[in-house]
């Protein structure tokens, strides 16, 4: 069985060693053929707490780590730059 991989954006980093990654899946509607976007949120394991909100990451499927965590951060593709003005 091949491991699944997804690319998404970190939308929450408030938990310890866990981030929430939003993955956008685009597909044609079965009847109307219009392109529809569906956002799925995955809780992913981040052991070093290295991800921040807005980072673009690649996640991979893993064994169940908790009740809701079945994904782990494989690599950070794009880091976001935080300014001092954003904290105000």
UniProtKB/Swiss-Prot annotation:
GO biological process, any: translation
rRNA-binding is among the record's keywords: yes
GO molecular function: rRNA binding; structural constituent of ribosome
Listed GO CC annotations: cytosolic small ribosomal subunit
Disulfide bonds: none
PROSITE patterns per record: RIBOSOMAL_S17 (PS00056)
Keyword vocabulary terms for this entry: Ribonucleoprotein, Ribosomal protein, RNA-binding, rRNA-binding
Keyword field contains Ribonucleoprotein: yes
Superkingdom: Bacteria
Pfam families: Ribosomal_S17
Subunit structure: Part of the 30S ribosomal subunit.
Family per similarity comment: Belongs to the universal ribosomal protein uS17 family.
HAMAP family according to UniProt: Ribosomal_uS17_B
Functional summary from the UniProt entry: One of the primary rRNA binding proteins, it binds specifically to the 5'-end of 16S ribosomal RNA.
Protein name: Small ribosomal subunit protein uS17
Native organism: Prochlorococcus marinus (strain MIT 9515)
